[in-house]
From Swiss-Prot:
Signal peptide: none annotated. Keywords: ATP-binding, Ligase, Nucleotide-binding, Protein biosynthesis. This is Aspartyl/glutamyl-tRNA(Asn/Gln) amidotransferase subunit B. It is an enzyme of class 6 (ligase). It comes from Rhodopseudomonas palustris (strain BisB5). Gene3D superfamilies: 1.10.10.410, GatB domain, N-terminal subdomain. Allows the formation of correctly charged Asn-tRNA(Asn) or Gln-tRNA(Gln) through the transamidation of misacylated Asp-tRNA(Asn) or Glu-tRNA(Gln) in organisms which lack either or both of asparaginyl-tRNA or glutaminyl-tRNA synthetases. The reaction takes place in the presence of glutamine and ATP through an activated phospho-Asp-tRNA(Asn) or phospho-Glu-tRNA(Gln). One of its GO terms (biological process) is glutaminyl-tRNAGln biosynthesis via transamidation.
């Protein structure tokens, strides 16, 4: 869906340039209290087999019953991906044997998924943006988990995860680099978090990626792809793509051919290794599940869910840029996590003049607050400086009560000790000096003491900054910088 691949995205090989082609299948755990076809809990971290119903364990005679909340979450996700919502979809049985799959098949959707084609616009680190096509989103059951470390000669099965609802979100092969793939997964996770349809916690397995990689000479047909299963971090996704592309190029340049196979990524060795030959659809013998009726709902049902959607990242970013004059980069940083955007919105709500100081507030949230949080290894939820306190600091700057330099000192005090910023400014004598007479005396003293610098400044006006620095230093940072600038220009005839 995007422009031809850029030369910088091509991989240099012994026989020339190669293009990597990437498609992703994201498995996102649906945020719901119960599983897709049973009432068993979905909470993470329970004792093994403590969240298992008779349906999840595939006991004879137990029939699946659809969880409507999971259906709603899938529709909300589809709407957030600008996708076609299919008013009729079908659940199919995907037949394969594995010890953590008690039914002997997985209930999934094959030919008739709940969500059809959509798009995601992805901002890249270099400032470019790409549009990634969504092929489909379908609902399916998760499998259980095999425990290999509990006994020296036996493997145990934990079915807590069995039957948990997953959304499989399949992209088109529109990605052309590991950086694009990482940015896409990050954007997709952000959208799902905003929607509240998946918490996106990759450490807990709530979001996992199957990465499809192939290589080709530019302009040639797609090559044979390999699928790297269950990659559970954005960083590992990038590393897996880089390694796999190089591996395939090496084989092809040596005169070999690529086997279509499923591979695993080993983060300790930073390499992929073969797992099994890649199955085709016919290997799974899909057929409609006879225990489940087709899923049908009206357009009115979809429209009602659409009216309840929150403001999504792209919409919020556009509003921040249009209303408060933020740069695209700053707005992008703020909306990249819902918690960050919510904090900024809370600061705006407390400002006395958001129209005047909205941009200043963004600078303080991004540079001062985020910088200090990163330094101390904290996140926005545990910030010692509240939105109300940060808004008060921005207000004090905006109204001219304190300078930016004093504001940074005030921020440190609030971070360490807490307290009301206005009261701290009063109690500690931190107010900015705006009395022109007092400032003028300091300016006159410095000008009189530095005739050589005066001559340099007259010849080279950029030297004015030296005088400003001296005045601010002499006043303890309390002099109004604009007043200092104006006085110096007048005194020096600039």
């Amino acid at each position: 869906m995007n422009a031809p691949v850029k030369p910088s995205q091509l991989i240099k090989g012994a026989t020339g340039d190669w293009e990597v082609v990437i498609g992703l299948e994201i498995h996102a755990q649906v945020s719901s209290n119960a599983k897709l076809f049973s009432g068993a809990a979905t909470a993470f971290g329970g004792d093994p087999n403590s969240h298992v119903s008779l349906v999840d364990a595939a006991m004879p005679g137990m029939l699946p019953v659809i969880n409507e909340e999971c259906v709603k979450q899938a529709i909300r996700s589809g709407l957030g991906l600008n996708a076609q919502i299919n008013l009729r979809s079908v659940f199919d049985r995907k037949n394969y044997f594995y010890p953590d799959l008690p039914q002997g098949y997985q209930i999934s959707q094959y030919k008739s998924p709940i969500v059809g084609e959509g798009i995601v616009v992805v901002d890249l680190p270099n400032g470019d943006s790409i549009t990634v096509g969504i092929e489909r989103l379908h609902l399916e059951q998760d499998a259980g988990k095999l425990l290999h470390d509990q006994h020296p000669t036996m493997t145990f099965v934990d079915l807590n995860r069995s039957g948990v609802a997953l959304m499989e979100i399949v992209s088109k092969p529109d990605l052309r680099s590991s950086e694009q793939a990482k940015a896409y997964v990050s954007k997709l996770r952000t959208i799902l978090r905003y929607l509240g349809t998946c918490d996106g916690d990759m450490e807990k397995g709530s979001l996992r990626a199957d990465v499809n990689v192939s290589v080709r000479k530019p302009g040639e047909p797609y090559g044979t792809r390999c699928e790297i299963k269950n990659v559970n971090s954005i960083r590992f996704i990038g590393q897996a793509i880089e390694y796999e592309a190089r591996r395939q190029i090496g084989i092809l340049e040596d005169g070999g051919s690529i086997d279509q196979e499923t591979r695993l990524y080993d983060p300790d060795k930073a390499e992929t290794r073969s797992m099994r030959s890649k199955e085709e659809a016919h290997d799974y013998r899909y057929f409609p599940d006879p225990d489940l009726l087709p899923l049908e709902f009206s357009q009115a049902y979809v429209d009602e869910l659409k009216t309840g959607l929150p403001e999504l990242p792209d919409q919020k970013k556009s509003r921040f840029i249009g209303t408060f004059g933020l740069s695209s980069d700053d707005a992008g940083v703020l909306v990249s996590e819902r918690e960050s955007a919510d904090f900024y919105e809370a600061v705006l709500a407390k400002l006395s003049d958001a129209a005047r100081d909205g941009k200043l507030a963004a600078n303080w949230v991004i540079n001062e607050l985020f910088g200090r949080l990163n330094k101390d290894g904290q996140n926005i939820d545990t910030s010692p400086v509240s939105a109300a306190q940060l808004a008060a600091i921005v207000d004090l700057i905006g109204e001219g009560t304190i300078s930016g330099k004093i504001a940074k000192e005030l921020f440190e005090i609030v971070w360490r000790e807490g307290g009301d910023p206005r009261e701290l400014v009063e109690a500690r004598g931190m107010k900015q000096v705006t009395d022109l007479t007092a400032i003028e005396k300091v300016v006159d003293d410095i000008v009189a003491s530095n005739p050589d610098k005066v001559a340099q400044a007259i010849a080279k006006p950029a030297m004015l900054g030296w005088f400003v620095g001296q005045v601010m230093k002499s006043s303890g940072g309390k002099a109004n910088p604009q007043a200092v600038n104006d006085l110096l220009k007048r005194k020096l005839g600039l």
